[in-house]
Amino acid sequence: MSGDENKLKKYRFPETLTNQSRWFGLPLDELIPAAICIGWGITTSKYLFGIGAAVLVYFGIKKLKKGRGSSWLRDLIYWYMPTALLRGIFS
């Protein structure tokens, strides 16, 4: 059995197959729009409005996803956004 165990040790299995990268505890599809709102609030000196918009955008994306993965949100954008806007992103 030790020979089989040594063969299995060279493979690394993730905890889940859909384990996505997170920054500051948030997946990128939720972090980027919120960071854009906060950045806009900082550049226009409307700090509270930027933070409030970021919170609303964050919860809006969470409600839209409803426990589904980031790929579902990407596919939704692919099917419902105009082709001219997404030509360079989805090729």
Swiss-Prot record:
Superkingdom classification of source: Bacteria
A cellular-component GO term for this protein: cell outer membrane
InterPro entries: Pilus_assmbly_TraL, T4SS_TraL
GO biological process: pilus assembly
Subcellular location: Cell outer membrane
Keywords: Cell outer membrane, Conjugation, Membrane, Plasmid
NCBIfam families: TraL_TIGR (TIGR02762)
Function noted in UniProt: Membrane protein involved in F pilin formation.
Protein name according to UniProt: Protein TraL
